[in-house]
Design a protein with these regions (language model features):
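Residues forming the flavin
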Residues: 1-214
Length: 214
């Protein structure tokens, strides 16, 4: 029998070789939008005070407070993502020469930090003219549908370079980021490989940093 129904290709996380194989074998594919941004970290007690409207925080019985943020800036969504109350920032790279971070909370949400992704919606047309971060790969030059993938890879590599070619994460105080200033010191962090001060506003694309700053 001939199967004529749909086929779902469940590639999982960071299966970039699969998409390159599909493009090389002339399987029709198209780019989709992604979300790119930073991870914010705060003292858990500060978020408790704000969310519970109590300068004494959450007390003995309330859980570590969460928050959610959603807005539109210049026609693109800007929103919090994967908020981790009483949690940690952890390395999440899936390949060499990458720095990627994620967040997690233990079951007791007992860390003295809380963190959240803060991301900007990115559409393929946003990056087509970004020569700084779109890799000039002649082998893939005939596959514009891979442009978003290359953009993501190069941004992860830039993070690795800015981190000193280690898993140290480039970081900036939030107030300095919005004012476009280098942070001369950084607060203590839950991210165990450590942080290094870096002007994120300078080397990340303006269509990301500008919307995040607003």
């Amino acid at each position: 029998k001939t199967f004529l129904g749909p086929v779902i290709l469940a590639t999982g996380h960071s299966a970039r070789d699969v998409y390159r194989w599909l493009a090389a074998n002339k399987v029709p594919i198209e780019a989709k939008g992604i979300a790119v941004g930073v991870r914010l970290e705060h003292p858990a007690g500060l978020i408790d005070q704000i969310q519970y409207h109590n300068r004494n925080g959450r007390g003995k019985y309330l859980p570590a407070a969460e928050y959610s943020f959603v807005t539109q800036v210049e026609g693109r969504g800007v929103y919090s993502f994967c908020m981790c109350p009483g949690g940690f920032i952890v390395p999440a790279a899936s390949g060499p020469e990458q720095v990627v971070v994620n967040g997690m909370s233990p079951s007791n949400r007992g860390s003295r930090w809380s963190n959240s992704g803060m991301v900007v919606e990115i559409q393929p047309e946003d990056i087509m003219n970004d020569e700084r971060l779109t890799m000039n790969d002649e082998a893939e030059g005939s596959h514009p549908e891979l442009a978003v993938l290359r953009f993501q890879e190069e941004l992860e590599r830039q993070c690795w370079l800015q981190g000193g070619r280690r898993q140290t994460a480039p970081a900036q105080r939030m107030a300095d980021f919005t004012r476009r200033k280098l942070s001369y010191d950084l607060p203590e962090s839950s991210y165990s490989p450590g942080l290094i001060s870096s002007p994120l506003h300078f080397w990340m694309p303006e269509f990301i940093t500008g919307r995040l700053s607003q």
